[in-house]
């Protein structure tokens, strides 16, 4: 026991300190200070002579060893060392899982960062032949940025850093908090002292909550088991003498224990430390449960206060590509920012509506031209000379014997002929001396 080194276990427990809650850090302090230090320092000096000073009032060879085995089937110090190792095992296993998960997440983040590029993808510039003499040089014309890219870029997270490189731990923490976390956690941590010292939210963001609770339950079960075993083996005090009747002792002999009072006090201290660790485990489980319940209540209140969100924007491709005359190569998509895509979609809708109005106006103008009566000014020239012996037309001369209604209709036709058409592409040619107006 004098050469026992606790440095390895202490380093492991200090690493667990970085992935535990506030109550878990208190438990770790109690474990390191009151258990490891007391067992390594106090137990070494108190129990160093427990077998050498255990004497019996007989000279029978082997009787002392048999009686000491009956008095202490397992040494107090060895029992407590075994208890520390077993109780620390769930925490060490949790640490191994946490380190593996975080290392895997950082590796995935590094690969994702390597796939990111500082700008849009540029196609390799083709090697063009030199221009003929007299032509301008094409080397200063720049490179055309493509508008097409593979769809594998769509799975990249929005808001990612532009250049390649690995993010720091603080940036990844803020990133996950802004997205709503990873794993089982849904809470968003605000920057500040409260967010920095709350290990529960960090465990939720890292997706380690279930494993952390499982190791708490196992640790509490081990504490209860060792408390029961310590009571069954040693009771609550170390007696000053022990009556032994085992073979090869010739009769019932009395054996005497060295420093029984000091060992009794130390035994009671270890009982208190074990109960304190068990209480801290229960408090930590209650802290995790109440904290998760509070986060759920706050999330519901925030959702009810915010009210229903805005209606989702329709997809950019609201019209089929075949109807719009668009065709894209397979596995390709337009590289457009989210804001620009929405603005372009609205502009396309406005352009389509304006084009529909123009088409409707053109169709209405064509139908109006088909349904309009012929011009009255062309009657005299288009009909030709009157037939021989036929009656003169009511509108052919000023001295015709037509009725008043016919004269009114002829006047209306003349006004309609002289009025310009709506939507015609060319103007009209007319004369100021009263000649007929001809539309082209």
Curated annotation (Swiss-Prot):
Residues 1-21, 100-223, 286-440 are cytoplasmic. Its main location: membrane. It comes from the Eukaryota. Mainly expressed by oligodendrocytes in the central nervous system. Expressed in optic nerve (at protein level). PROSITE patterns: CONNEXINS_1, CONNEXINS_2. The modification Phosphoserine is found at residue 372. Keywords: Cell junction, Cell membrane, Gap junction, Membrane, Phosphoprotein, Transmembrane, Transmembrane helix. GO terms for molecular function: gap junction channel activity; gap junction channel activity involved in cell communication by electrical coupling. GO terms for biological process: cell communication by electrical coupling; cell-cell signaling; negative regulation of G1/S transition of mitotic cell cycle; positive regulation of calcium ion transmembrane transport; positive regulation of gene expression; positive regulation of oligodendrocyte progenitor proliferation; response to toxic substance. GO terms for cellular component: connexin complex; gap junction; myelin sheath; neuronal cell body; paranode region of axon; perikaryon; proximal neuron projection. Pfam families: Connexin (PF00029). One gap junction consists of a cluster of closely packed pairs of transmembrane channels, the connexons, through which materials of low MW diffuse from one cell to a neighboring cell. May play a role in myelination in central and peripheral nervous systems. This is Gap junction gamma-2 protein. It comes from Rattus norvegicus (Rat). The gene is Gjc2.
